[in-house]
């Protein structure tokens, strides 16, 4: 079983405190399911980015399976890995969609638990899903250490084909923060350029702007894999629901991390 790695750090360890914090994240937001295929959510501590993430989860539809693409911050494990372990959070147990996972056999995606063991980017999304949908769903966690354009397009296409054949209702979630440790005005300027490419569903444009701006968006690969898969399944538009940065909470606008909530329909 994949035990929580960052409970008590990124979000509360005790279930009652975690539910209280999640409730605060959703405060004032209308819970209204939209026909969403994909989304971008931040993965910082809930005190910093939980409110931004809640903008996505408030409108996320109920699905059989949520495919979660996250960057590999730790460097452990395979370059592209899927976990087939059961995942545990303070709110309970989540099963992996082993049928979809088995479809990845022999592909660029390795079954590998090591890459997931200490990685926070996917884990921090799970209590949001549990808060909204209880335990009535499965996940497919994909951790991307390799984030080059060719790899993520291959992964996104592969997942989309599997989902299409399965007939299941699936939503894709890309876990990513945006610019790291720049003054707020510069971070927003860089992030606006990357977000514009995302809203245009333009994967090559994301990479072009990323290199040109030397941007420190940590989950550009997961975002691009999510966009690739969503487009394969018919997505035609994207929308920015919310943008913020860590300075809004800490008060330090000289070195912020950017957070965006984006949906793809």
Curated annotation (Swiss-Prot):
CDD domains named in the record: MEMO_like
Name of the protein described by the UniProt record: MEMO1 family protein Mbar_A1422
Family: Belongs to the MEMO1 family.
Family annotation (Pfam families): Memo
The organism's place on the tree of life at top rank: Archaea
């Amino acid at each position: 079983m994949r035990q929580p790695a960052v409970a008590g750090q990124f979000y509360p360890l005790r279930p009652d405190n975690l539910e209280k914090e999640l409730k605060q994240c959703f405060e004032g937001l209308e819970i209204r399911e939209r026909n969403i295929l994909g989304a971008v959510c931040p993965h910082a501590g809930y005190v910093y980015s939980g409110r931004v993430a809640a903008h996505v989860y408030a409108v996320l539809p109920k699905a059989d399976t949520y495919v979660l693409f996250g960057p590999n911050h730790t460097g452990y494990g395979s370059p592209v890995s899927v976990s087939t372990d059961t995942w545990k959070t303070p709110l309970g147990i989540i099963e992996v969609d082993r049928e979809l996972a088995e479809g990845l056999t022999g592909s660029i995606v390795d079954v590998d638990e090591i890459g997931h063991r200490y990685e926070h980017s996917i884990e921090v999304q799970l209590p949001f899903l549990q808060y909204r949908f209880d335990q009535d769903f499965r996940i497919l966690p994909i951790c991307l250490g390799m984030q080059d354009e060719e790899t993520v397009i291959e992964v996104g296409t592969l997942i989309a084909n599997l989902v299409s054949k399965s007939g299941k209702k699936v939503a894709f979630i890309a876990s990513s923060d945006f610019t790291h440790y720049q003054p707020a005005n510069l971070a927003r300027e860089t992030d606006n350029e990357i977000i514009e490419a995302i809203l245009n569903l333009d994967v090559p444009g994301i990479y072009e702007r990323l290199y040109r701006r030397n941007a420190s968006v940590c989950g550009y690969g997961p975002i691009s894999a999510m966009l690739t898969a969503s487009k394969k399944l018919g997505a035609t538009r994207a929308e920015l629901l919310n943008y913020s940065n860590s300075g809004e909470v800490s008060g330090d606008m000289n070195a912020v991390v950017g957070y965006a909530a984006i949906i793809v329909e």
